[in-house]
Amino acid sequence: AVEKGIIAYDLVNIRDFAFDRHHTCDDAPYGGGAGQLLLPEPLGLALDSVEAYKKTKHVIYVTPSGKPFTQKKAQELSRKDEIVLICGRYEGIDQRIIDYYVDEEISIGDYVMSSGEVAATVIVDTVYRLVDGVITSESLDEESFSGSLLEYPQYTRPNVYKGMEVPSVLSSGNHEEIRKWRLFKSLQKTLRNRPDLIQKARTDGTLTEEAEKMIGTLTDFVTYKNDRKQKSKLRYVQSRTKDSGK
């Protein structure tokens, strides 16, 4: 995408804007406390030097205290011409930089890392692939979170691996049955790993009536079988809890 000119990026080192020969960019916080803060002067000068800041004025500070980064936010950012990401270090940055420059604070999760560069890389990678021309729209439409649900399981050759066979429906050529199987498996995975997304889809009105009916049949373990004697059809097999002896 970079070679094709679809996207471009630039890296700015705030140490290049420090005032002393040691390129000092941090100091102890007022009021005491552990750790160091990035100094406002070199960071501010670094931001002033960025052409994207001059053009768009859209600056993001990557911090654990920011709003959660989501696929929806990534899609929103992908439509902007340019964005600027501030990568924090140590205990963070001076609040005055946030007040003066920052438009939004974003967090990639409820955990703390040693620096913001890795978090910024996550945001960049998530956003740039949504830019027109980077990845086909069909691939994006079927990914996890693009339709409020996690993506269904994927299989490729060989047909049998370590005794495990690819579900026969996927090679049946019946596109409608394949679609139903994928929706079913997507719902199954979402209910197991991220049930909150189901509720969100209901709230947003993106969960279809077909999906709701499938959810009504799901238990902890659901399998898909292909009836060879009749036309391909979905058969939902509910798991039974084994007698624990209690």
Task: List PLM regions with ranges.
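S-adenosyl-L-methionine/SAH cofactor-binding core of RNA-modifying enzymes
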Residues: L37-R89, Q95, D132-G133
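Internal, active-site/partner-interface "lid" segment
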Residues: V118, L130-V169
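Hydrophobic/aromatic beta-strand patches that form the interior of the parallel beta-sheet core
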Residues: D10-V12, H58-I60, I83-V84, E104-I106
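Structured adenosyl-cofactor binding patch, chiefly the S-adenosyl-L-methionine
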Residues: I97-E143
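Gly/Ser/Thr-rich beta-alpha loop segments that engage phosphate groups in nucleotides
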Residues: A34-L37, P68, Y90, D94, ...
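Fold-independent oxyanion-binding glycine-rich loops
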Residues: I14, V62-S65, C87-Y90, G109, ...
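SAM-dependent methyltransferases
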Residues: P158-K246
